Amino acid sequence: MRRKLAAGNWKMNGTGAALDALEAIAGAHSAAAVDLLICPPATLLYRAAQVAEGSRVRIGGQDCHAVTAGAHTGDISAMMLADAGASAVILGHSERRADHGETDAQVCDKARAALEAGLIAIICIGETLAQREAGQTLDVVCAQLAGSVPDGIDGTRVVVAYEPVWAIGTGLVPTLEQIAEVHDTLRQQLIGRFGSETAEAIRLLYGGSVKPGNAAEIFAVSNVDGALVGGASLTAADFSPIVSALEQAAG
């Protein structure tokens, strides 16, 4: 049985004062029946890990380099994230793909490095609005899945997050039927590539304007194992109801 996961991506938000929100989230879910992850900016990662120590909340990074060390100014390796207290890392987010031109092959290399460093790799995929309107959604996400997920994986260490680019931060959300179609297709693609045992261990998250008001209905969709939450993860007031909805879905 896959354990549900509520992951918060703080993106480029938060200074030291934001750790109060992390403390509040941890305090509100001291006996959480689902996995909790907060991915703060790199500048807060070590301090966030200290705040979260002893709680049910784990801390993750928002990106990593594909190599361990070297002349890569401004980059952070997976080993560095782990050393700072991270247990997971988000990879291939659409904002990274758009702002930094990251390719599926680069995301795959980063995922391999993350897994080798002992981190859980959260690999993001998703179509643009133009691709959705052109009827290309399944082709796009299946190609991203094939190109971004490494071979030879332990399914318990890999998470795939479906985030339609057009739904991120816009308030727009796909229909429940559209979410189900993508998640069911991704599961079948994973089974075809890795076999049932590995594929059924991989958690599939939905991301894109997840809020307290729509979380419960999204979590009721088949093959949705949780959420990768953006802006709504910045405060306990918004994130806690999402976590509670996921706990209800987990039974």
Swiss-Prot record:
Cytoplasm among keywords: yes
- Which cellular compartments is it found in? Cytoplasm
CDD domains of this UniProt entry?
TIM
Q: Which SUPFAM superfamilies match?
A: Triosephosphate isomerase (TIM)
GO BP field: gluconeogenesis; glyceraldehyde-3-phosphate biosynthetic process; glycerol catabolic process; glycolytic process
> Could you tell me the EC number(s) of this protein?
5.3.1.1
Q: Which UniProt keywords apply?
A: Cytoplasm, Gluconeogenesis, Glycolysis, Isomerase
The residues listed in the UniProt record as binding substrate, with positions renumbered to this chain, are: N9, W10, K11, G169, S209, G230, G231
Q: Which domain of life is it from?
A: Bacteria
Disulfide bond annotation, renumbered to this chain? none
The record ties this protein, via PANTHER family, to: TRIOSEPHOSPHATE ISOMERASE (PTHR21139:SF42)
Instruction: Please report the name of this protein according to its UniProt entry.
Output: Triosephosphate isomerase
Species, as recorded: Ruegeria pomeroyi (strain ATCC 700808 / DSM 15171 / DSS-3)
